[in-house]
């Protein structure tokens, strides 16, 4: 098993319930293949640097994963096929930090939000 960090952007018109369903679909694939989601972070609805299709904003979501390369390929394939996901990037990591990501820390200080990080050990 290897550690991966995956960030994906979901269309701005998708509800939070539908976002949870998308993440749950990925979680099912990971669990069925003996992988683990170590950390999940919702970074919120953010303005994109440039317009992607008709989207000026997108819901950003981060996953810290402990999975095999085959599972990574399957998740990326599902992301490509999902029309609600407009961009994604998955990178290999040495480890997954238990601390909130810099994006989440920055968002919480700007908006006085409570940081919500789900960590599974």
Swiss-Prot record:
This is Small ribosomal subunit protein bS6. Belongs to the bacterial ribosomal protein bS6 family. InterPro entries: Ribosomal_bS6, Ribosomal_bS6_sf, Ribosomal_S6_plastid/chlpt, Transl_elong_EF1B/ribsomal_bS6. Pfam families: Ribosomal_S6. Binds together with bS18 to 16S ribosomal RNA. GO terms for molecular function: small ribosomal subunit rRNA binding; structural constituent of ribosome. GO terms for biological process: translation. One of its GO terms (cellular component) is ribosome. Gene3D superfamilies: 3.30.70.60. CDD domains: bS6. Keywords: Ribonucleoprotein, Ribosomal protein, RNA-binding, rRNA-binding.
């Amino acid at each position: 098993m290897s550690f991966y960090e995956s960030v994906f952007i979901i269309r701005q018109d998708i509800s939070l319930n539908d976002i949870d369903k998308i993440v749950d679909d990925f979680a099912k694939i990971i669990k069925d293949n003996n992988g683990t989601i170590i950390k999940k972070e919702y970074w919120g609805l953010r303005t994109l640097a440039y317009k992607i299709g008709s989207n000026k904003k997108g819901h950003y979501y981060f996953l810290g994963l402990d999975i095999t390369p085959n599972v990574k390929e399957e998740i990326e394939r599902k992301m490509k096929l999902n029309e609600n996901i407009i961009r994604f990037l998955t990178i290999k990591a040495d480890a997954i930090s238990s601390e909130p990501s810099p994006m989440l820390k920055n968002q919480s200080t700007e908006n006085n939000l409570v940081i919500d990080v789900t960590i599974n050990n």
